[in-house]
């Protein structure tokens, strides 16, 4: 499994380095890499990741009333159809991988000129997290990337429609709707400081022990309090706000913000993406007392990292060196995800 993933990454990285010199034939390879990613996620052994055992349970018990409030209707409906026809959990892995991977590959072509570089970063980061683990949110994150294009081109109704579809696949997608009111206008001097300061403010919430569970909001406060109790009883892991991956993300965020004026000439969606990344980093620390919410918000908004990390090449000359640095960062993050965070069982 890991060897296959590494080989696909090497193929993508090779084409990323020489993408500028390739003909239209590169899109055939691009599609074939996508097919390989779908098959790898679709036929992975149950138990090799952290969530597939639960998905197998949801699949075979799709009509169990206990799951009505915790599993989205779309997952139960698709599971019911596939169970009756195939009775194999891999069928739903394939369906979700097909949508999750395809949506992202389409989005990469819209969001960046360096599609293979984005593909390589994706393989190293969110492919492992979403298509191999959190398959429901994998579709939502793909729809989010497509919605960025719609929002930045003032087609907010289209973006709203995409968010509504995303909500069918994962309830946490409800957090995406505030993005509809965000602007993609160039940052002013004050705005740069605000969005940069928001990341630091997250640590302020962490050190001051400010928790959302104390907010007097009916139902939500009760739900958050339940998460807090589960954490105290040891059923939910603590959030390490000083883990190496998160610190690297912060460094890259400030690096890109420093070179904002250079990068924005190449990335028409930079302002909105940086706002989303700032929210992602802020949420991870500010919501750390509620690990489930902390990870959900941070990982969903953080999908823009795939494009942002490719933007590093615009700040380095020659571009080849910039691509190598971006690929190296991606490979290191993949190594940490597999061997340190153990997102894939060896």
Model-derived features with residue positions:
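Membrane-interfacial loop-to-transmembrane alpha-helix junctions, especially the N-terminal start
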Residues: 26-30, 266-277, 321-326
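Transmembrane-helix signature of polytopic, membrane-embedded enzymes
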Residues: 105-125
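Membrane-interface transmembrane helices that cradle and orient dolichyl/undecaprenyl
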Residues: 144-158
């Amino acid at each position: 499994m890991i060897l296959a993933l590494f080989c696909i990454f090497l193929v993508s990285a090779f084409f990323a380095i020489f993408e500028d010199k390739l003909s239209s034939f590169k899109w055939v390879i691009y599609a074939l890499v996508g097919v390989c990613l779908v098959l790898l996620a679709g036929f992975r052994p149950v138990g090799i990741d952290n969530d597939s055992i639960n998905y197998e349970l949801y699949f075979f018990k799709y009509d169990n009333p206990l799951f009505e409030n915790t599993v989205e209707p779309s997952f139960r409906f698709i599971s019911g159809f596939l169970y009756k026809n195939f009775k194999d959990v891999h069928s739903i892995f394939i369906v979700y991988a097909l949508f999750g991977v395809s949506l992202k590959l389409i989005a990469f072509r819209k969001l960046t000129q360096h599609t293979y570089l984005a593909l390589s970063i994706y393989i190293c980061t969110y492919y492992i997290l979403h298509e191999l683990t959190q398959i429901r949110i994998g579709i939502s994150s793909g729809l989010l990337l497509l919605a960025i294009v719609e929002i930045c081109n003032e087609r907010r109704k289209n973006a709203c429609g995409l968010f509504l579809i995303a909500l069918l696949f994962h309830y946490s997608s409800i957090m995406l709707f505030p993005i509809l009111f965000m602007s993609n206008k160039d940052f002013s001097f004050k705005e740069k400081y605000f969005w940069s300061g928001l990341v630091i403010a997250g640590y302020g919430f962490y050190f001051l022990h400010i928790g959302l569970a104390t907010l007097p909001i009916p139902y939500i406060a009760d739900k958050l309090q339940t998460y807090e109790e589960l954490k105290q009883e040891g059923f939910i892991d603590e959030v390490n706000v000083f883990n190496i991956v998160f610190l690297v993300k912060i460094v890259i965020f400030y690096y890109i913000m420093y070179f904002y004026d250079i990068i924005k000439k190449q990335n028409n969606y930079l302002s909105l993406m940086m706002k989303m990344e700032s929210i992602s980093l802020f949420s991870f620390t500010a919501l750390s007392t509620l690990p489930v919410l902390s990870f959900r918000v941070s990982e969903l908004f953080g999908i823009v990292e795939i494009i942002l990390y490719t933007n590093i090449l615009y700040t380095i000359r020659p571009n080849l060196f910039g691509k190598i640095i971006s690929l190296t960062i991606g490979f290191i993050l993949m190594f940490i995800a597999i061997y340190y965070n153990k997102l894939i069982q060896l």
